[in-house]
Amino acid sequence: SILQITISTNFAGHAGQDSALAPNGIGYGDLFLAPSWTPFGVDAHHQNDNAANGTRWTYGFNLDNRWSNTGGTFSLYALNGSNNSNNALLSENFLSCILDIQCFYRDGQVVSVNPTSSSVANTGVTGTWAVNPNSSIVFTLNTTGTALNNYSDLALHWSQTCGCDVIEGVGTLPEPATLALLGLGLFGLGVSRRQSK
């Protein structure tokens, strides 16, 4: 089954800005996934939700070059640690205000898979990501043979490396057989349209 996730953000196409605040500037964060969403807090925007108290993410799409404004590839990592801090790098690992320049970032936000952590495992599965400037970032992955293929719900988390604009939520996934039937139906519709012309 093909999983495609679109993150709508005006930041798309602007990686590398604010290079005075961090090496390479602000980049794109990795995409994190889990079978359920358990944000911290009851406020509408979950402003106090962070790596220590929110959803424990179970998979991460580790980007090949988070400062590319065209996209690239990513590696799927299984996040096996008991908490997010064991599995990920946080916003403060990428950005701080130590350069005697006033800056703003959201402390404690999961931003990147930590590929050097002993609690994460590269699954060997790769996907692609593309940037639509001023609009969106699109992640595409073939989930065949992964546990993601068995999820009925899919929670996600994405942010820039500064952690300022966190996008989180949950959606229901169709059954893999339903996706295959839908694809077959659309193919049949395309064939019937061609034949009728």
Model-based region annotation:
Residues 1-172:
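Surface-exposed extracytoplasmic segments
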Residues 174-193:
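A short, hydrophobic C-terminal helix/tail in secreted or cell-surface proteins
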Residues 196-197:
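C-terminal outer-membrane/trafficking sorting elements
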